[in-house]
Amino acid sequence: MSWLRTSPLRQSLTRSGSSSGNGSSGTATTMRQRPIDAATDCDPRACYDSFCKHWQQAHEIIQHPGTPTHDDVLGVVSHLDYMVTLLLVELHHCNKVSLPSADAAPPAAPCLEYLLSENLLDKLYEWASSTGRYANAVRLEQLKLYELLVSHSRHQLLCHEPFLRPLLKILASSQGEIFPPDLEKRLVILLNQLCVVLMQNVHLLDLFFFSAQTQVQEQIQNGSLPAPKSGTTTNFIIFSLLIPYVHREGSLGHQARDALLLCMALSQKNSNIGHYIAQYSSICPLLVTGLGGLYSRLPNSIEINSIDWHRITPDDVTEIPELTLFMNALEFCNAVVQVAHEMIKQQLLDFMYQGFIVPVLGPAILQTNIDSQISAMSYLDLILRSITEPGLMRAFVKFLLDTEKFDGERILDALVERLHSPDANLCMVTMALFDTLLGLHCEDLMLELLLKYMLPGKHVPISHRHKINKIDPYLNTTEFFLELTPDVMKRARDLARPKSVQELVDPAATATTTATAPSMLLSLPSPVMSKTIGANWNYYGHYTGDSLYANVQAYLFEAHSRIAQCQRDCRKWANSYRYQKWPRQGQARATAHALELARQFFSEFGTAAPVVAAPVASEAGEKQLDSLQSIGESSGYESFKWRPADEDAEGIDVTTTTTASASDTDLEHNNNSSSISSGRRDSWRISHSSRNEILLTDLDFSEDLFAQGTVSLGPFLNAIWSKLQTFTSNSLYVNLHLTGLITRLAWYPLPLIHSLLLRSDIAITSDTPSFHQVLRMLKQQIDAELPVAENSLEIIDVARSYLIDREFRLVNARKITDNSPLHQQLQHQQQHQQLAQTNSHTQQQQQQQQQQAQQRSTYATLSAATPVQASPTSAYDPFRRSDNKRRSISRSITSMFSRRSTSSTPASNGNSASSGLSQIYAFFTGAASTLVGGSGGEGSGARGAAQDSTRGNTCETSLSTAPRQEPQTNVGSSSNSSIGSSTQTLSGTHSSSTLHGVESGLQTGNFNSEPVSLDSVASMGIIANTSGTERSRDLALCAVLLDEWLKELAAVALEQSVVLVTEQLL
């Protein structure tokens, strides 16, 4: 994808003297094709005589008066070819490594000395300027000659003026010229080699730089060198010649960008070059405008061919030529910011922000079309994942948080709003973008998204705020998350567990382990997954082909590495973001304000002042104080903040502790008595054994005591929690991104985030249900709609096998394109299965009955079974979204009480004769299909026709939140949930996955035509024989996913507690 990764720039810096570099390796000329045998002994005198003879013949042609003819040019080029060959032989022998000796003289190079002493290159340039229409051909041979000499002689020739002066002349005359492609290639190669030589010999940089300034000006004044078309003389002519080729495609652009990067790196070593590039060159505006132009060529709408697509991959970049050019330009800008001089870096960042990020990316992201939003956010996600320079990253973060450029609307707020989008693709792309943003570990982003809403601590009751910064090492949060596992998954795990635990653990320690830590058994891989869990996981990033399902050790290792990386990045932040309590000392004005609020509070309630004014410890006083203390425990307003007993050592101001009096007279009366003051302090501490102590300095009276439960955690967390509440209605892929995003938040080793996500002992009072409350609701919903039954366990097993199969496909399979043979094979299999499904429905029913009977007998020995493993080319999809097994309650009730037409069939007439109450009862017990949809035989026989006739129906809002489905006869595994729970949990928005399947069917006109991806390989052979409605299959998939996610959260909580307790002890 990147030109920089495959660029010869990495190898160019370590070239040896005998190597020819980029240019010489690509030279396809006659002089390079001639074999030069290094082992052949050449007579230096003979070589020198031949060299001089060829130059004499070429010089005679050059001296001819008049315009050179075609034969003259060919003659000079031919003699020049022989001269270059002799020079190569001489330089090759001069560069040989030989053992030093006392009488050894430096190797002689008579041909090169003759070339320099007679100014042959200068004479050749003067003649080439008068060749007319053959000027480009002669210039091409000159560039080849300079290229070979620079690559073979390294830096020695640059020190000689007879070589440097004609080289600068030919380079200066090339400014502003338009050359043919072969000449441009030679010029860029020569410039690249010069940059490599200067990079390796920095001491020549000033000589070359100032020579370009003085000598060219002298030649222009003397008339021997034409003035450049730009009208000004450049100081660093190599850099100015490379600028026009920065956005070229192919190898020419690669060579030019390599050379420009070397020039940028040279600016770090020479401030004159950095000042020239920043002040007098147009490289920064050119890079930014070119980047904006390349972005405008990107597709405004990305064609999505898979239901799980959420971001642009390197394969996508390779397949889209416009995206490849844009990424090349972006990575070049990133490299320039990394290696260039500080002046150049700052100028480029300013131009990037003002010329590309704000005017180009901003309007693109704020578009209203969903397809345009998906493409723009995908490009932004790709940009953020590609750039590595912190300065450039800060520019994009500033762009997300800027409130002045877009009429007061922040880009970050617009992105948060899109988390509520009902479009599954837009929601997944948005969550993938936020996953990238959270992975940056940026302090500013985390402050705006989360921390600024959590720092005041108002979302935590006052009695629990002291726990935020203190981690209890004995708090077992792991058990809390594991207890939230749905009951059906617990039952499936019990059935999958072997009868004798001693086979997996030490027999001597089995009893104690089971009694003390029953949750430890969950870390043991279940035998059902014995052939698929990561037994060969080596923790070095090598995937051995085994599944990571139920592998808690892998979760622990992943959590440990992620938390450690996040901790290293967060240590660089400017603030620690720990909860700060109300200050006890100083700030007299704030203390006086707190006193006034306290007086107003006690004067309103009127009962607290007499109680605390008298320093007595009577039983009545104790009861009153206990009743006052109970306000913080029992009332819903959390009036007081409790202070733990371990804070007794902290100093307390006496005057601060005597502020419990409710009137000024009581305060003045007791000011002169220290004993009464101490007695008052003791009156607040009736029992020293009490765990919590009340101190008015810990009371934040500025808070509204009756505003508990209205504190917002911010739009980002509210959007995440609202999406999590619809967990059972979301598509699988949305839930995968949602759980991954929350897990990434849990990796942050910050006490505030840890208390919000991983602390079960801290209550949260906000305007939305807390994270733990949402998890409890999901457990209750799944338990109610998917009870522990034989059919539910069967669907759970199929869902688990589907997820494992998906894991194998994602890891081992390559991307399936529309034109690939595998995709064509899958389409052929799907068409064949559609035909076979309508012709062999009776056989499928028989096989289903046999499998159910066999599974009843084998469920007791489920631990010895191996889950179904479908190959990537199989047609197994246990959750085919197009299955018509769900009904709308509105249509069912309408069909119950509506008057049937006289032309209805006998079957329909018979169904209409059924009572309405029986049909309602049958609907909620899963048998409505047999009452409303006709007899069993007719319903079974008409399954394919019913699917074809209803695939064009639109989706309606109903209790089931799904498209209207035709009646089915299979009701064996329907959920027996109550009406209340169904109404509460199923009245939300439509399921994204279900709607997506319907939309795809409408567009293509094919019932089974879902967008093809690794996860849409329809495996219908097994799921067709699995009983249960589509809702039950969706719930089973959610249950398996929730079970695995809870294990991951338990592992994160365990590792996070270790990290925070360690920091607390240090």
Curated annotation (Swiss-Prot):
UniProt organism field: Drosophila mojavensis (Fruit fly)
Record lineage: Eukaryota, Metazoa, Ecdysozoa, Arthropoda, Hexapoda
Iron found in the keyword field: no
Protein name: FHIP family protein GI14169
Keywords, comma-separated and alphabetical: Phosphoprotein
Region entry Disordered, spans: 1-35, 651-682, 821-913, 935-1007
PTM sites of type Phosphoserine: 500, 820
First and last residue of the signal peptide: none
UniProt cross-references to InterPro entries, sorted A to Z: FHIP, FHIP_C, FHIP_KELAA_motif
Pfam families: DUF5917, KELAA, RAI16-like
Polar residues biased stretches: 1-11, 856-874, 947-971
Biased composition (Low complexity): 12-30, 655-678, 822-855, 890-913, 972-997
Family: Belongs to the FHIP family.
